[in-house]
């Protein structure tokens, strides 16, 4: 193992020879990051990405000024999907070190799970990984049920079964119950619902290669809410929370669903399929029906749902939708506290009616007359939330994954959103 490169922090500007905009400098003792007080966490993350780009794979965070947030900012920029890296962490107090260790364990799990090839991570594997993570932090306070394949059809989970039946790998619903109270009759405080499409070809509405090559990450919503629950537990979550992961492949085969098919859901809604690549909302609907049946105070669903959200926000923000202004404000406050990027996009009553069908109550995609794709997708989901005007948040996870590296992130998953949702659950 090579000797560690020392990384220190300074509030003084770099020597003029490095240029007036220099964020780091190099000397015989190692590398100094020059903080300016404007965006210190972002500066540290961007510098870490540059340090990794220099091929430095063993570092020691040394000297004064390091805390859990600054260490984490460094790791977010330093971590990448290829190769190995070693960080020697500075001395932190017990609480800060525990917080950092929990982030490293759980959010790295989220990033690594999203980055996993679809060949390795099918619907069953995703569900089991989620169970293993939550069980690791919750112990005997968690129970779960896995329903798959034809059992889904027999039990009325028609959206999930319809989307997933075209794959040889059976679709799976994970229903997990975290109940720290020990009381089987305890009310459910919150339900988390995640889209777990482990590979999305688009189905018969097939994607072009440029839009399909990152679709191993289409289970990013499921990974995010799983990580959020695990992280909230490490922060002392003492309320009952249920997790529903809707896991499937969306592939083409002789048994795959087709345009013009009509899906009848357990709540009586009939949906005409006019785009098999708008499959995420079809599987989430089943999870939202189950979540609503629990009568929780709070329902949060997370999904890499629309390209429209990415068009609006790029990969820099998660898109937030809600009819509940107070709840949306609480989520945005949590995001601010955790230094994670969320941006609220419009969701109005009229978006719920912008999915007309000639043959069913709903179409699974908006027509050219209604181009607000992210908002109409949220409007679609609202039809499966019993009390959609209160207590429901929809997160379109546009900041989950990057196809190419940028100055602060490597290519691949980011893990953004985990801490914000956990913060809201424990507030």
Curated annotation (Swiss-Prot):
Binds 2 manganese ions per subunit. Keywords: Aminopeptidase, Cytoplasm, Hydrolase, Manganese, Metal-binding, Protease. Mn(2+) 2 binds at residues 195, 200, 218, 279. GO terms for biological process: proteolysis. It catalyses: Release of an N-terminal amino acid, Xaa, from a peptide or arylamide. Xaa is preferably Glu or Asp but may be other amino acids, including Leu, Met, His, Cys and Gln. The active site is at residues 207, 281. One of its GO terms (cellular component) is cytoplasm. Its cofactor is Mn(2+). The keyword Hydrolase applies. Its EC number is 3.4.11.23. PROSITE patterns: CYTOSOL_AP. It is found in: Cytoplasm. GO terms for molecular function: manganese ion binding; metalloaminopeptidase activity. Probably plays an important role in intracellular peptide degradation. Belongs to the peptidase M17 family. PANTHER family: LEUCINE AMINOPEPTIDASE-RELATED (PTHR11963), PEPTIDASE B (PTHR11963:SF20). This is Peptidase B. It comes from Escherichia coli O139:H28 (strain E24377A / ETEC).
